[in-house]
Amino acid sequence: MSKKLEKITTRKENFADWYTSIVNNAKLIQYTDIKGMMVFQPNAWAIWEAIKNQIDVEFKKHGVRNLAMPTLIPLSEFQKEKDHIEGFAPELFMVNQIGDKKLDNSYAIRPTSEILFCNYFKNIVNSYNDLPIKNNQWCSVMRAEKTTRPFLRNAEFHWQELHAIFASENEADSFAKVILDVYTDFVQNYLCIPVIKGLKTPWERFAGAQKTYTIEAMMQDGQALQSATSHYLGQFFAKAYDIKFQGQDNQMHYVHQMSAGLSTRIIGALIMVHADDQGLILPPDIAFNQIAILTIFSNKNPQLLKISQQICEQLNNYRLFEDHSDKGIGYKLAQQEIEGTPICILVGAKELVNQQVVIVRRDTHEKINVDLTDLKLIIPKLLADIKRNIYEKAKKDLEDSIVFVNNIEELKQVIAQNKMAKAFFDGTKEDDEQIKLLTNASTRCIFDETQNGQCFYTNKKTNKLTLFARAY
């Protein structure tokens, strides 16, 4: 049996405390003296680096090039687009003074970079021959959140923001959908998180967007988490910042824009979808250590170190971690469970005699005796099966938790059971707010699929199937 770590609260006891104890015990985040400003420890940063590396590859396949924008934005620039500043004004961090000198014109620390990209695009686009332009940056942004939680709501968080301009509405809107597909494939195939794709309601759109496409994931407590978004911005920002190009007709036209983003919030989803009461469960593609080699009393038997070295040579194309300390094997295994290592290989005197090792799967806790000579053949199959199992479990949980409802009473019952609801809905923002007061759930997205039905709240005919859930 692996050593039980007393500091981990169980999900049944308190889900929020469980989440925090996982974050702390897995050495993901360290708090600082500034509210919401957190240290992303090496374990968390390794996950983020793996996410960055894979998404960057996918973006480049679609002609996206990286750049870096400044951190500060003149506040006067926000005034050009009133709706946008209304969306972010309460969250802005401001720079009002440099040294002893107070500024006549304040700067905002970027909460997002539409304004910076707009000014950049304005200066580099001239004619239709320059289009499309597709750029992305990996950076941190700052928003003064009232309530902060690691990964879910940081005052400073890391993300990528992709911005692109096109000659036509169809091109910009189509590319927004392409990027949403990139996110969907990545989150499902690499993070093993099943998602629901859809369109945000008008009142849930990104400030300034004509359409916001989203992927929503379900956490183990039944709440939804918006995992990534892609927006068709139309000509809203183009007109505010005068981004024009000369078309083939020799006339000047405003560009059409899109933007998209995925942040370190997705690490919070990774925890709340897969982790258990022993710690993280990381999909093999994203795990900072894919395999841990744990020797049992190697300080008393140096031969075990030679076996460990042989194993490392066999498996050198994986991310490996070795622990040859004199800590008990129960403690070593428990630590790897907390950190979500997909496979642990135990090497002891007994195994040495039989020229075998014991493999422990993180997802099922199953122990398997394997001949040393078979390791190279068995490990890739095991990792593939772990990945499949993690995804299938999460997918079944999601599918079992979506319930179709016909009226507000049914919605109340479903949400009270920590599930999500699917319903025909053609109401207003005010209707949505009233529904939230009654049920604690709100609209998350409108499904891609369309059917004819009757709105469960207004009784109007509609073809909009909508997801309702409590949400982070």
UniProtKB/Swiss-Prot annotation:
GO cellular component: aminoacyl-tRNA synthetase multienzyme complex; cytoplasm
Keyword field contains Zinc-finger: no
PROSITE patterns documented for this protein: AA_TRNA_LIGASE_II
Top-level taxon: Bacteria
Assigned EC number: 6.1.1.15
Main localisation: cytoplasm
Keywords noted in UniProt: Aminoacyl-tRNA synthetase, ATP-binding, Cytoplasm, Ligase, Nucleotide-binding, Protein biosynthesis
Pfam family, one: HGTP_anticodon
InterPro entries (alphabetical): aa-tRNA-synt_IIb, aa-tRNA-synth_II, aa-tRNA-synth_II/BPL/LPL, Anticodon-bd, Anticodon-bd_dom_sf, Pro-tRNA-ligase_IIa, Pro-tRNA-ligase_IIa_arc-type, Pro-tRNA_ligase_II_C
Reactions catalysed, as given in the entry: tRNA(Pro) + L-proline + ATP = L-prolyl-tRNA(Pro) + AMP + diphosphate
GO molecular function: ATP binding; proline-tRNA ligase activity
GO BP terms, alphabetized: prolyl-tRNA aminoacylation
Compartment(s): Cytoplasm
Subunit structure: Homodimer.
Entry text on domains: Consists of three domains: the N-terminal catalytic domain, the anticodon-binding domain and the C-terminal extension.
Its biological purpose: Catalyzes the attachment of proline to tRNA(Pro) in a two-step reaction: proline is first activated by ATP to form Pro-AMP and then transferred to the acceptor end of tRNA(Pro).
Family: Belongs to the class-II aminoacyl-tRNA synthetase family. ProS type 3 subfamily.
NCBIfam families referenced in this protein's UniProt entry, alphabetically: proS_fam_I
Protein name, per record: Proline--tRNA ligase
The species this protein was found in: Ureaplasma parvum serovar 3 (strain ATCC 700970)
Gene for this chain: proS
